[in-house]
C-alpha cells in the first residue's frame, strides 16, 4: 500500500450517536476502514464507558478500544442550538448509527423519516436489544438479554446447573460487526440506486442467527426433541469438546473421517470396532465413556503440549485451551496483528484486538487515536458547516459545545479497573 492510496471508506462521513459496545463497534469498524466518524457526546462525561477499564488522565482503555478512529463532537442537545447544528450537518452525512432504546432517537428529532426528507441518500442504522418492531421491542435490554431471548443462554453450561453467562460481549461485538457489514451493503446499494435506507439490527436477531443446528430440527420434529445443556462437550458431535490433560485442557474435535487419525495417535485403532464408538450417533450416546478413554490416554503424557504434539503428528484437530494472556502472547496472534499494540499519550502502550478480517491492500492500523470529549469540535464544525471562530466562541459561551470533559477521575481513581455488565 502506498501513502497516496485512499482508505477504503475515505470520503464517507458517519454521524455516531452510539454508546457502550454494539453501536461503537459498528462505527469503529467504519472508522478503521477510513470513514470520517463523528461521535456525538452529549455531556462532559461523554460515553459511559469513559469511566470503565483502566482510566488515566482523562482516557479509558475501554473507551479507546471501542472508539478509536473517531472524532468527538461534544454538544448539548437539550439546547435548541445544539440540535440545530446537528440537523444542519445531515445533508453532508452519509451514515448515521445509533443504539438508543427504540423510539428515543425519533423523540430527539433524529428519526429516519425526518432525516430522509433532509437527505434521501442517508443510510441510517439503529441497533437495539430486540429490534425496532414487535412486542419485545420496547423492553430495555443489554447483550445478555438478547442472548436469553434468543434461546442461547439456555444452551450454555452444565446440564444439572443454571445456565451460565459468558464474561465477554459476544452479542454486542457480533451485532456491531453485522451492522457494519449491513452499512457497507447499503452504501453499495446507494451507489446503484441513489437512495439511502434504514437498517434495523438487534442483539436478539444476531444471537438467533448463531444457532448452528437445532432451529430446523425443532421445527421439523416439534415436541419430539429438546436441546439440553451439554457443558464442555458438543451436544451433537463426539468427540468434540474440552478434555483434561496434565497441566491444562485441550479442545479436541474428530469427525467420522478423522476418527482413524485420532485412534492412531492414541495407539488404539481397534476402538473403531467398538460398537459404542463406531458412528457419531453412538459416540454421542456414549460420550462419557469415550471421554474417559481419551482423558485416560492424555494422562499418560507429562504435560498438555506433549499430548498436542502427538495429536498434531496425525493432524487431529486440537488446540490448547489458552488463558487470555497466553493467547495475547502467542506469536501467531502477534504476527497477524490479531493482537496489536497501540499508544495513547495518557495510557501509554497497550494491546487491543485487531480487525476481524485482514485486507490485502492495507494492514491493520496501529497508529490509531481516541479523542477526548469535544476534542474535535472546532475542526468538525469548521469543515462541515463553515462555523466561524466568532460563532464557535459564542457556542462555547452558551454551553452548546462541550469540551474538556472526560471520565470522572473523582469517581474512578487513575489506574483502577472498573467493569460493568455488557450493554448494547
Please identify what each model-predicted range represents.
Residues 1-192, 219, 225-226, 372, ...:
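N-terminal helix-loop segment corresponding to the beta1-alpha1 unit
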Residues 44, 129-131, 203-208, 247-249, ...:
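Glycine-rich beta-alpha junction loops
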Residues 187-230:
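Substrate-binding/catalytic subdomain of NAD(P)-dependent oxidoreductase enzymes
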Residues 313-366:
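A glycine-rich dinucleotide-binding beta-alpha-beta segment and adjacent secondary-structure elements
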Residues 350-389:
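C-terminal active-site "lid" helix and adjoining low-complexity regulatory extension at the edge
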Amino acid at each position: 500500500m502506498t501513502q497516496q492510496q485512499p482508505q477504503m471508506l475515505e470520503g464517507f462521513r458517519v454521524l455516531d450517536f452510539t454508546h457502550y459496545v454494539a453501536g461503537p463497534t459498528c462505527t469503529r469498524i467504519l472508522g478503521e476502514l477510513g470513514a470520517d466518524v463523528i461521535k456525538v457526546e452529549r455531556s462532559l462525561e461523554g460515553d459511559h464507558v469513559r469511566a470503565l477499564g483502566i482510566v488515566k488522565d482523562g482516557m479509558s482503555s475501554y473507551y479507546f478500544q471501542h472508539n478509536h478512529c473517531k472524532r468527538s463532537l461534544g454538544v448539548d442537545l437539550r439546547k435548541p442550538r445544539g440540535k440545530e447544528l446537528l440537523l444542519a450537518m445531515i445533508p453532508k452525512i452519509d451514515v448515521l448509527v445509533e443504539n438508543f432504546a427504540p423510539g428515543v432517537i425519533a423523540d430527539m428529532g433524529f428519526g429516519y423519516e425526518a432525516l430522509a426528507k433532509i437527505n434521501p441518500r442517508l443510510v441510517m442504522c439503529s441497533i437495539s436489544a430486540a429490534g425496532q418492531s414487535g412486542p419485545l421491542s420496547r423492553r430495555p435490554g443489554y447483550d445478555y438479554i438478547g442472548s436469553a431471548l434468543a434461546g442461547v443462554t439456555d444452551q450454555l453450561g452444565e446440564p444439572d446447573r443454571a445456565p451460565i453467562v459468558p464474561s465477554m460481549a459476544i452479542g454486542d461485538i457480533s451485532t456491531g460487526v453485522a451492522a457494519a457489514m449491513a452499512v457497507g451493503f447499503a452504501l453499495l446499494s446507494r451507489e446503484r440506486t441513489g437512495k439511502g435506507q434504514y437498517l434495523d439490527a438487534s442483539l436478539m436477531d444476531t444471537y438467533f442467527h448463531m444457532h448452528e443446528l437445532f432451529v430446523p430440527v425443532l421445527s421439523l420434529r416439534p415436541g419430539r426433541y429438546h436441546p439440553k445443556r451439554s457443558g464442555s462437550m458438543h451436544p451433537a458431535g463426539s468427540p468434540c469438546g474440552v478434555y483434561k490433560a496434565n497441566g491444562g485442557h485441550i479442545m479436541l474435535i474428530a469427525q467420522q473421517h478423522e476418527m482413524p487419525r485420532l485412534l492412531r495417535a492414541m495407539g488404539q485403532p481397534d476402538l473403531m470396532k467398538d460398537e459404542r464408538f463406531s458412528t457419531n450417533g453412538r459416540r454421542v450416546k456414549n460420550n462419557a465413556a469415550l471421554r474417559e478413554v481419551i482423558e485416560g490416554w492424555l494422562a499418560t503424557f507429562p504435560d498438555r503440549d506433549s499430548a498436542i504434539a502427538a495429536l498434531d503428528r496425525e493432524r487431529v484437530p486440537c488446540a490448547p485451551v489458552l488463558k487470555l494472556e497466553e493467547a495475547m502472547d502467542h506469536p501467531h496472534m502477534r504476527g497477524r496483528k490479531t493482537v496489536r499494540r497501540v499508544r495513547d499519550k495518557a495510557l501509554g502502550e497497550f494491546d487491543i484486538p485487531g480487525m476481524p478480517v485482514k485486507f490485502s491492500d492495507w494492514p491493520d492500523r496501529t497508529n490509531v487515536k481516541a479523542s477526548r470529549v469535544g476534542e474535535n469540535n472546532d475542526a468538525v464544525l469548521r469543515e462541515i458547516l463553515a462555523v466561524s471562530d466568532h460563532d464557535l466562541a459564542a457556542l462555547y459561551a452558551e454551553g452548546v459545545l462541550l469540551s474538556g470533559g472526560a471520565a470522572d477521575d473523582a469517581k474512578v481513581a487513575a489506574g483502577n479497573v472498573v467493569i460493568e455488565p455488557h450493554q448494547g
